[in-house]
Amino acid sequence: MTEFKENFCMAPWTHMSVWQTGDAYPCCIYHWDMPVDNINRSGLKGAWNSEKMRELRLRMLSNEPSEGCAKCTNYDKQGIISYRHKFNTEYDHHYDLVKTTQEDGTVEQMNLAYFDIRFSNLCNMKCRSCGPHFSSKWSEDLIGKPEIVQINHQDMWEEIEEVLPTIEEVYFTGGESLFMPQHYRLLDMLIERGLKPRLTYNSNATRLSLKGKHIKDYWQHFDHIFYCVSLDQVGKKAEYTRAGQTWDTVF
């Protein structure tokens, strides 16, 4: 295993976290108000080598702390296993790509070994711990109707297709990913090419199909699936906490 300095993380060379607003981050716990770019404006390729992403890579190579990485820095100080530790442990086999980093921080090869994409805020529930940013249902209380926020870059699917062979793990969340047609489209693309990355989900487990497409028919094409169910309570308490949930229908 490669030995890394304390402020170095493999994430900017192996990962991108894209939110439903189009905001792009080097990872999902990078400071939420410090996106490196927005793919609705710049696309995946533009975000991969945006000015802020290039600056972040150079800071890490110089072992300089970055404000956006404060959560991992705090975890490390407390002896808690951080995302930084996760990336450096699980993706150190991509270190040769780090060596290709140019003087301005550019990395020519877009490598999304771990791809975290949140296509939209489309959701069938209105959890008390959530809000309109992550649930279209919450917008009903604010503007009287659901407001769907979604990635809308015109070249998104072409760019995703180009990077598919580099993906080792896809993380789906939302909104509710199993409620989104884009989620099934991405799985179709992977299946058509015979690609089998790990699939990781954060789901409310209330529905496993969409318009006749059942998730079990998709999952049988993949070898590793991690399905994390978001539950706070059970029974009536669960229905109270997660408005729209019927406990008897939870998978």
Question: Which ranges hold each PLM region?
Answer:
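Accessory C-terminal segments flanking Radical SAM cores
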Residues: 1-93, 97, 111-114
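Generic structural signal for small/hydrophobic residues in well-ordered secondary structure
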Residues: 19-22, 44, 72, 119, ...
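Non-transmembrane alpha-helical segments in soluble domains
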Residues: 45-48, 70, 127, 131, ...
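Short microdomains enriched in Cys/His and/or Lys/Arg
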Residues: 47, 88-105, 113, 142-160
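Short pre-active-site segment immediately N-terminal to redox-active cysteine/selenocysteine motifs
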Residues: 68, 76, 122-126, 131-134
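Core AdoMet radical
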Residues: 112-122, 131-152, 165-180, 193-211, ...
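Short amphipathic alpha-helix with an adjacent loop that forms part of the alpha/beta core around
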Residues: 156-163, 213-219
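Distinct, well-ordered alpha-helical segments
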Residues: 184-188, 210-218
